[in-house]
Amino acid sequence: MTVLVRLLAAAAFALIAVTPLRAQDFSTAQRGEIEKIIRDYIIAHPEVLQEAMSELEKRQQAAELEKARTAVKSHSDAIFNSPRQVTLGNPQGDVTFVEFFDYNCGYCKRALSDMMELMKKDPKVKVVLKEFPVLGASSVEAAQVAVAVRMQDPKKYLDFHQKLLMGRGQADKARAMAVAKEVGLDTARIERDLKSEEVAKTLEESMKLAEALGLNGTPSYVIGNDVVIGAVGFAALNQKVQAARK
């Protein structure tokens, strides 16, 4: 903490951290003088505001991540072992890598290669995919079809996932159904399954988990007990996986 910040903290303490009785000991003139000192410091050194805001943001982010880690422990079974989830990689892996994604998320498209590289280079990692359609009705439609694909043939899910995520244009029901047909799935059965309780409950489960974890964007990851927000790249994700093994 800089000398300037310590001075401002001391001045603020004199104003707000004293007991009610002592606060009354300051006259109006004295309180005005203290406020003037603080104001003069801020005007003379406006960078302290940026420093304070940066520190506040760091503390808020740290608090949010700690809250998310606590939520991971509270919901670990649903996060890592739900019967409704898509599991790739090593199903008996020593570290579970969970991704919340949206088929219309540009950053998710970029992050797909990170997940694929991780599975290729680390045969001991278990990968779990959870549909998290936050970008509108089209995303919900695509996610619903994806769940129906998993229900019909989990082995074809990854091929479907890659083709739909990396395709051009908006991912919606029509495009998702076209991709499902392309990978050899029964689209008539998918149409029936879209009305099933299983599809609705799968997406509901993912949305509730994301809410509990404080996630509001994609891609978001849970790796071990840690939460990672955003397309941070293969190196950062791999580092988290290795840390989870320790």
Segments predicted by a language model, with ranges:
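Short pre-active-site segment immediately N-terminal to redox-active cysteine/selenocysteine motifs
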Residues: F101-N104, G217
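Structural alpha/beta surface segment adjacent to cysteine/selenocysteine redox centers
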Residues: V98, K109-K181, D186, E211-N216, ...
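Bacterial N-terminal signal peptides
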Residues: L8-A17
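N-terminal targeting signals for export/organelle localization
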Residues: T2, T19-H75
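C-terminal cap of thioredoxin/glutaredoxin-like
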Residues: L4-L8, Q24-R39, A178-K246
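A short beta-strand-turn-helix
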Residues: D77-V95, M119
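N-terminal secretory signal peptides that target proteins for export/translocation
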Residues: M1-L4, F97
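The canonical Cys-X-X-Cys-His
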Residues: C105-K109, Y221-V222
